[in-house]
Amino acid sequence: GTAGTYFPLGGAIADILNKNVPGANASAQSTGASVANINLLQQDKVDIAFVQNDIAYYAVNGSEMFKDKKVPSIQGLATLYPETIQIVTLDKSGIKSLNDVKGKRVAVGAAGSGTEANARQILEAYGITYDDIKVQYLSFAEASNALKDGNVDVAFVTAGHPTAAIQDIATQNHVVLLPVDSDKADALIAKYPFYTKLTIAAKTYPNQEADVQAIAVRAMLAVTDKMDADTGYAITKAIFSNLDRLKAAHSVANAVSKATALDGMSVPVNPG
């Protein structure tokens, strides 16, 4: 859809390519989320797509929502910025750590979504399975209402931070973000190469007095192996030479840099 971060950034990238890459005829298309975008790449309906690096990994490896539907042709141009896995509870729940969630009502994301896979993998790192919790398959819009109404105890959301929906809950409630401890994060990164560590700085949300250690997946630009190296190079060079245009389109682009463009690269890189 047009409400997220991909659409304004896609428009900016199309603009950059049309001005800097000879013969480019780029336009931004409003699509579904990462899974839909992988399918569009596979069907040759688009040449470049924004996807989360975890979804790209599942596609190339034929796992999770791509079980029995492997898409080996997917390649990466660059990873762009983090999509933080935020684990939200309210102060009154008394939950201070993921070790405390056994027996609790946990919203893990919509069934079959990237968020749901993130939640399952993180809980697994803590030795917790869905049998140990009361699992609720809710989108974050549904989960935020359920948190406010006291119908769930903890909710997972994967989104660049600060996330508007969490800010919204925090206006009326004392929100607490649960950390992913460093040793657990290291174990997750060793097993799933799409994860990276990051810190949600103190004061990102109201009442948040301390930094919170988190892990993130990364938004990336994906193509297929049909894109030749020269084109891949020209596109990547144009984008990284015009980052100011991206930053003007959306604040998440402040995190985009050449230095981190291979962080969390979970699929083969286009030779360009």
Predicted regions and their residues:
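A structural signal for short loop-to-beta-strand junctions that line the ligand-binding cleft
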Residues: 67-80, 204-213
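An extracytoplasmic/periplasmic, membrane-proximal ligand-sensing/linker region
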Residues: 138, 142, 149, 159-179, ...
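Bilobed "Venus flytrap"/periplasmic-binding protein-like clamshell domains
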Residues: 1-25, 82-149, 244, 267-272
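Alpha-to-beta junction loops
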Residues: 42-51, 104-106, 149-157, 172-176
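Pocket-flanking alpha-helical
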Residues: 11-15, 27-68, 95, 141-146, ...
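A bilobed periplasmic-binding-protein/Venus flytrap-type ligand-binding module shared by bacterial periplasmic
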Residues: 84-95, 192, 214-231
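Extracytoplasmic
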Residues: 21-23, 33-36, 43, 71-72, ...
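N-terminal secretory/targeting leader peptides
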Residues: 15-36, 43-45, 123, 150, ...
